[in-house]
Amino acid sequence: GFAKDRMAAYGVPTARYGRFTDVAAAKAFLDTLTAPFVLKADGLAAGKGVVIAETREEAEAELADMLSGKFGGASAELVIEEFMEGEEASIFVITDGINYLTLPAAQDHKRIGDGDTGPNTGGMGAYAPAPVMTPELMKRVEEEVTVPMLRGMAGDGMPYRGVLYIGVMVTPDGPKVVEFNCRFGDPECQVLMMQMEADIVPLLLAASTGGMRANEFAQLLPMDANPKPAVTVVVAAPGYPGTPEKGSVIRNLHHAGHGDGVMIFHAGTALDADGNFIANGGRVLNVTATGENLREAVDRAYAAIGEIDWPEGVYRRDIGWRALN
């Protein structure tokens, strides 16, 4: 709700919305919208606090669940939005409150199943750069979102420093903000790190201390140099995004991570008493690769997954499909 109010104040394009703590008022707001309806828990809900309800009945049931504590304190307040039709992308800005550096756009895959089916997750894979975000659209996001938000926050006495995650929907009317996060995305961060040409720590330190200077860090990720495509595929434990089954042994990770351009980031892993890696969370591994083109990066990532001895692992087989098609 705070973010939506700031966007309204600064003229940043986003979906029409309302904020509610009362079921009756929330149901009344549904009368002003047409299905599908977007319902968001106002607080942090591990990436699962957004529900797209296809019918009025589903929306009413879901909003009642949320306001009665489905996500604990995170859904004590509910944001209801009009549905935006389009393709989504993630844009990351690193800023000290005045100066900023925009990273290449990434695109993640929220649904658990191939073809974007099944329930929402924290993200089952990502790739960058995302072709849907053309240079023209990136410029519009900078002018219509990044600059107004940073200037507005600073002008209101609360300059924003750090990583600003801008979730954008590319609609027929242009880019509109779906959400902001005060962090990198997971798994988008993994692909962006693979594209970095130098250590990102000095940039983050400069952002946090207000010491960024224009163009000082441009060599980290030259926007005009077409950074190599990168992809990450999340391998999850069975049961995710519900209750994940923990404890299954994962073998051959060392060998699998030695392919050209491949890096495996651990997420939900642990070591058992014998020193074996085991599944210890929902999203367990991020198998990440770069390539001369996206197809090569995708092939490398899936080849690495094929080397991992973990039959219980669950993953999508179509990461990057929008760009590849």
Language model region names:
Residues E142-L164, N181-G261, D272:
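Active-site "cap" helix and flanking loop/linker of ATP-utilizing ligase/carboxylase catalytic domains
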Residues G113-G115, Q219-L221, A270-F277:
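Short beta-strand/turn micro-motifs at beta-sheet edges
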Residues G49-Q190:
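Internal nucleotide-binding/catalytic subdomain
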Residues G47-G49, V231, G281-N286:
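Short amphipathic alpha-helical segments
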Residues G1-R16, A25-D31, F37-V38:
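Conserved N-proximal alpha/beta basic substrate-recognition cap immediately N-terminal to
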Residues T34-R56:
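Conserved anion/nucleotide-ligand pocket segment
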Residues A25-A26, E58-A61, G242-P244, E292-D299:
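Short, conserved charged micro-motifs
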Residues T269-D274, I278-N325:
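Generic C-terminus detector
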